[in-house]
Amino acid sequence: MTATVQHTVKTEVCLRGDVASQPISDSKPPTWVAVLQQHEYQSSVTYHKLDDNRLIPDVFGYSYLRDIADQGKKQSTGKQHARVIQAYSKIHSLLSPPWKSSSIDSNTKTRENKGSPVILEDKRCAFIERLEPPPNSKADIVSTVFAQVNLQTPTGPPLEQFLSCRASNIKANDLKNAAEGVRRPITISTGICLFSSRLLGFIPTNGLSVSHDATETVVPPLPYTTVATFYELETCTRMAMTIAGLAVTASTGGTAGSRPIVVRLDVPNLQYYCYPLELLEAGLVSWEYVEEWFRLVDRRHRQVATLLKDTIIHEVRRRNCDVQVDVTSGTIAATQLLRLCVLGRRKIPSVNDMLFVLSWIGPYQAAWREFLAIVDDCQRPKDLRSLALMAYVFEVMYPALQQATTKTKTPHGKGEESSGRPLLIQVDDIAEWRIFDRAEMLLKRFKHRQHGLDPLLVGVFPSPRIFTSEDQGRSTLFLHDPGLKISQTRPPSSGGDSEDHSCVVGPLDIIGQIYGAEVQDTLMRLIIERGLSPEDEFELD
């Protein structure tokens, strides 16, 4: 990795026409991050105050820039930062467009110019992620800029965010329509995995795991744990805050009109059924193992889906707004068939059987027929795992598919409100970028097939502020779960020798240090309510 060059510049980016650009001040508050390191017997956490350009300590490939400068090169950090800011500014303008001058007040003879009630601030800071290819690979280094974009909401605490965005689908006419008061349906999609790879003993998307010497397939223990993992807690927190910023902006800006802002949570279960079935087909586990695995996954699905839903609603209501949150169920026909065959008949249905019931049974059948019609034959799923992965893309696209199949009025209809292009916002970890890319590609085919029905897909990917220390690859709590007992060597408020302040903490303690005591207390209450606290361990349904 090359050293980070320090720059001191003045901000020239004005995100809103009614907000004057201000120079960067040396007094702006620092950013705190936590770094988790795994050791032989116990993981540890250290906290770092980022108040200058620097590498994030012990986190390979990650750095922090306090003042971004445009270096004049197309792929420079400054250029990438500017593109992220421009993308989020477009999304912000769609959700809460600059209000036109109001009519002249008959009493005061004055005209009031109103701006967005949610103020967007470009802090000219960023996290930089540089992923180097594996040894002997010809792939390029992939750099991602997560720009710091803070939101000041009319009520409630401000939101400090580091985001990467994709908004190239937003056209000038979309912004023009928003400024003229054209309303549009808004759907925010997000997702979360279950457990962690450490608890599962495998990576769900990779399939069968093998031993270290690659001589035998690993059969993981059944996931009986009832305690929320660090990954689940941190993901709920990060996604909830980003979604709250978008939902509050849209609510106060009025861009959704009388329609509720809908948040759809894609919490997998079909994806987690695949692994034990592959073990069963390999003759490594019994039917009883598979049945118990299904039961435990179903329980975790209910708990984590409710935890994420409640966390989002809490963060939105802290800012005096509301939102409709639904858990997706687009694969319900397939999961019901799978459960019937496996639990009732001890048979594994074929992938063609699964595709048939998705296309012809249940409330989502028309959407699935529309979806599969735009999927190339070579991309159609050949096994259960590839079908489960395809379902992620379906769920992101579902609001558009539903509009096509139910013949919802288009912008040219005569509904009670004029309607712009439906806005689909994917809020997810940057590791899920492939879902966005594939949905974006399929939506272009969808537009051609639907004679102009043109949903507007954008992506918002929040960076974590709790990092894992790895030799290579992306920092991720799912793959590198530090466990529930972590040695804290340097609390943010401490001074002097870190050994004097050593103690054992849990995930919620670390989340509280980074995101605040209110977030920590809320999560503690919610995990107790949902049976995900340490006190619930070993208590089975």
Swiss-Prot record:
GO terms for molecular function: ligase activity. Changing residue 432 to A: Leads to complete loss of cyclodipeptide formation. Pathway: Secondary metabolite biosynthesis. This is Arginine-containing cyclodipeptide synthase avaA. Belongs to the arginine-containing cyclodipeptide synthase family. Keywords: Ligase. Its EC number is 6.3.2.-. Changing residue 515 to A: Leads to complete loss of cyclodipeptide formation. Changing residue 428 to A: Leads to complete loss of cyclodipeptide formation. The keyword Metal-binding does not apply.
